[in-house]
Amino acid sequence: MRTYILFITLLCTLSLKAQIVDCTPSKPTGDDEVTVTFDLTKCSFQKASLVDFEGPIYSHMGVITSESPSGTEWKSRIALWPDKTTPDKCNIDAVKLQKVGDNLWQLKITPSVKEFFMQNTQMEPPYEFKADEQLLSIEFVLRNADGTMDGRATGDKKSNIKLLLSHTIAPGEDSPRPEGVQRGINYHNDESLTLVLFAPGKQFAYLMSELSNWEVKEDYRMKRDGDYFWITLNHLIPGKEYAFYYLVDGLLDIADPYANKILERKFDKGISPVAYPNLMEFPEKCKADIVSVWQTAKPEYPWEVTDFKGVRQDRLTIYELLLRDFTRNGEYKGNLKLALEKLDYLKSLGINAIELMPFCKIDGITNWGYHSTFFFATEKVYGTEEDYKKFIDECHKRGIAVIMDIVLDHAYGTCSLVRLYADPPGNTKAQPAADNPWFNMVSPNTKYSWGADFNHESKETQILLDSICAFWLKEYKLDGFRFDFSKGFTNTPGDGSAYDPDRIRIIKRLSDEIRKRKSDAYLIYEHLAGDQEEKELAEHDLMLWGKQNSPFSNAINGVQKGSSFKGAMASSKGWSKNNRVTYMESHDEERVAYNASVNGIGEIRTELEAVSYTHLRAHETVLD
């Protein structure tokens, strides 16, 4: 037998570091003696403040257990509130804190958490813990003797300590994976599937779902096959959506990183039912905050265009589109259904490609999309998976290619691949740990970095990125990608501006793998590096973003200096192939017409509408 500590994840009202500045031991169990130190300066107060109060201070406290129906109900409590009982039943020595420093007060819970509540409760009759009942969390509210002053967590919530539960975990079954299964969800038929989690170095994993009533059950312990954990499920209800996550080493609640649909407790409530009708509700009993979804017998989208062929890449006229703002009607509520109504308008502009700003699942729901977390799932705030496919299908019917803007240089902390190997584990704000198979501990870029930095030299990262690109090309019939900040596709230290042969090798490898699957895929890199490096990539038939915002802005503003369009041409760079994607505006640049309204000379500023039409039509000719 191997003994592990099983950590039950709760909906915490306060992180340990926010108000409780010290807890000994740092990861207590219900069988431990625990000493807790509170910092009054980090409390909020419903009544009078306890800051600088000299005492006495007492704790009103309770314990949440596995028997708490809602996951928040106190099953046993100590020290009733003074306005509800006589002082002798609330101001007891067991919950009286000791001052140990300026605004620092300490409480000792002894001889153990369970014994402490059994010996000191004022509940009538006293609550008796069941033999198999698990203590999950202790909650506190600090107060003075008569309850006219109190201290609690920010937002008028109680402070909270998570408890670890000691369990003896038997060795799991070692068994080879079924033949042909891949990482993620593998559907066999309308009632059966196999889940596969790649987690090298981890000891055990459980499937958590409604099938187990969101509890740890041996029937849902995953089998182990080397670096993989897997489980096959049968007798599922065809067409039904099941939410699930993996509990890894009793500590980490991980949504499947390969899932096509993600639910979030915090953000799903902000998704409009107009954009996403009948969205599955977040499961009430689930202890994790992010879960994945499987669905057998899912209806196939009936593609109308199955053989779309876009224009030659040197004939692309691209419209960059942020779904959030494109049809927002005064609010950040743009969606795919509204964007569909504008396709004929976009076609009338003369475009033949739309570059959709990132629509992989992001951290939150209202940013530009560059905070990617789940790379195989769509962002639900814009619509359903079927809505995305219909948008692409309708674009193809109009001769418009769809290019996916995608972020493959970093991911954010709620990404399962980050959390699975974070330091400390599971922390969404922590940096990747040294054993993370996909991410660098620290970005090698000394100037530009966001979130967790992908280690592009890692074989596992390369496998992952190849899978991501292959998925979107096949499942959504996308026509190509625009790779954000490809300057970050390297482990070479520095700001990314120097010539980097390793980066060239990495980008060529990724591009070649994509073209094995789709030979005519549009591959655009936001590289913005030196001429030598960009020329090598262009000669590999890759397209490079060519920023020309300043020349076009100067031209429309009536400023002669710096208004040459020479840099828009690939030939000006010495390229033999016309692979420069020149743009006068992008999401990172100011709109040239607005710039002219502020900085234009003379009548350009005062007669903007007439002048803008003339100048912008001229710019359109240059870019065509």
Describe the predicted segments one by one:
Residues 1-21:
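Bacterial Sec-dependent N-terminal signal peptides
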Residues 40-49:
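Short amphipathic, basic-aromatic surface patches that mediate peripheral association
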Residues 51, 56-132, 147-155, 188-189, ...:
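Aromatic-rich carbohydrate-binding modules that target alpha-glucans
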Residues 152-170:
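Short beta-strand elements
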Residues 168-205, 260-314:
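Basic K/R-rich, polyanion-interacting modules in nucleoproteins and related proteins
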Residues 226, 360, 368-371, 485-583:
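Active-site-proximal helices and loops of the catalytic beta/alpha 8
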Residues 261-270, 299-300, 304-316, 322-477, ...:
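Substrate-binding/active-site clefts of carbohydrate-active enzymes
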Residues 615-624:
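Single conserved hydrophobic/aromatic residue that forms the stacking wall/gate
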